[in-house]
Amino acid sequence: MSVARIGRGAALVCSGLLAIALAAPLGAAAQAPSNPSLNAQLLVGARQGDLAQVERVLAAGAVPSSRNRLGKTALILAAEKGNLAIVEAMLKGGADVDQASLEGVTPLMAASYAGAAPVVQRLLAAGAKTDVRDRMNKPAMVYAAGQGGAAAIDALLASGIDVDAAYEHGLTALMWAAGQGQADAVRLLLARGARRDLRDDRGLTAADIARQTNHLDVAEAIARP
């Protein structure tokens, strides 16, 4: 699936476009060849959540950095499914915690999108970088705020990310969460001190963005002192 470029104007915060922009890099994994090598078996095991297979082929010499046709490693496949056990196995086996897919999606971004807070925490503990951006210029926090939810956001904030950091087009995490109607994420961000008065490069606040995307309850929660 191609990734739609996030434009300016009201369509920027449209729920559909945000979902496409976030979800496209996380498409389905490639099918394994009919006579899979150890590396292919590693990818299949990670995709299917088969810890025993992952551990077996790693011990037999599978390369942790092996990638499928989308450039996804076994660590990314495990992270986007929130499979902490396989994430642990891959890290123990020497996987690069920041190796990205062809779309620039890192394991941390994949876990953040999935809302897999335990995996986010484990990747951060392993040294995953929070400031890396994908080919659409989105860091892990945008994946968490736009889709992953409060627990993933909280894990990222605990690593020291500024709650009011502005990303592409001046959008903060609060604005992304508001545009997607992520009420729990909005409440969490406000509780962590996110500013309601900040504006994106169109002059819109998070509450304005929530209204544009018809998330009126979220807009009200943001506007409420």
Which sequence ranges carry the predicted segments?
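Intrinsically disordered, low-complexity regulatory segments in ankyrin-centric signaling systems
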Residues: 2, 27-60, 69-72, 92, ...
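Ankyrin repeat A-helix N-terminal signature
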Residues: 44-49, 77-83, 110-116, 143-149, ...
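Leucine-rich solenoid repeat scaffolds
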Residues: 190, 196-225
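Ankyrin repeat structural motif
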Residues: 50-58, 83-91, 116-124, 149-157, ...
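Bacterial N-terminal signal peptides
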Residues: 13-24
